[in-house]
């Protein structure tokens, strides 16, 4: 797992209070990890702060899984 993926995973664990083994790249924030819409907004804000990237609302709406977040952040930092 890349450094970005590890940091995303830590943020998800901290914000959602889920077990580390549940957090995989294919895990859906809502369907698999029990997040609600407010949780997803807070996760996006945490990703922006941690990685120094801006995630526009339309992009945030397409970040549905841990892997989606990692891919967006990797692309934004490239």
UniProtKB/Swiss-Prot annotation:
Residues covered by the Carrier domain: 2-77
UniProt keyword annotations, A-Z: Cytoplasm, Fatty acid biosynthesis, Fatty acid metabolism, Lipid biosynthesis, Lipid metabolism, Phosphopantetheine, Phosphoprotein
Family matches, as SUPFAM superfamilies: ACP-like
PTM: 4'-phosphopantetheine is transferred from CoA to a specific serine of apo-ACP by AcpS. This modification is essential for activity because fatty acids are bound in thioester linkage to the sulfhydryl of the prosthetic group.
Organism superkingdom: Bacteria
Intracellular or extracellular location(s): Cytoplasm
GO cellular component: a single term: membrane
Major localization class: cytoplasm
PANTHER family linked to this entry: ACYL CARRIER PROTEIN, CARRIER DOMAIN-CONTAINING PROTEIN
NCBIfam families: acyl_carrier (TIGR00517), PRK00982.1-2 (NF002148), PRK00982.1-3 (NF002149), PRK00982.1-4 (NF002150), PRK00982.1-5 (NF002151)
Cited function: Carrier of the growing fatty acid chain in fatty acid biosynthesis.
HAMAP family recorded: Acyl_carrier (MF_01217)
Protein name as it appears in the record: Acyl carrier protein AcpP
Organism for this UniProt entry: Rhizobium meliloti (strain 1021) (Ensifer meliloti)
Gene name in the database record: acpP
């Amino acid at each position: 797992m890349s450094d970005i993926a590890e940091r995303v995973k830590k943020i998800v664990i901290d914000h959602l209070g889920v077990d580390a083994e549940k957090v995989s790249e294919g895990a859906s924030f809502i369907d698999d990890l029990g997040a609600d819409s407010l949780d997803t907004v807070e996760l996006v804000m945490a990703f922006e702060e941690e990685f120094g990237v801006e995630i526009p609302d339309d992009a945030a709406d397409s970040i549905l899984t841990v892997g989606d977040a990692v891919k967006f952040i990797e692309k934004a930092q490239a």
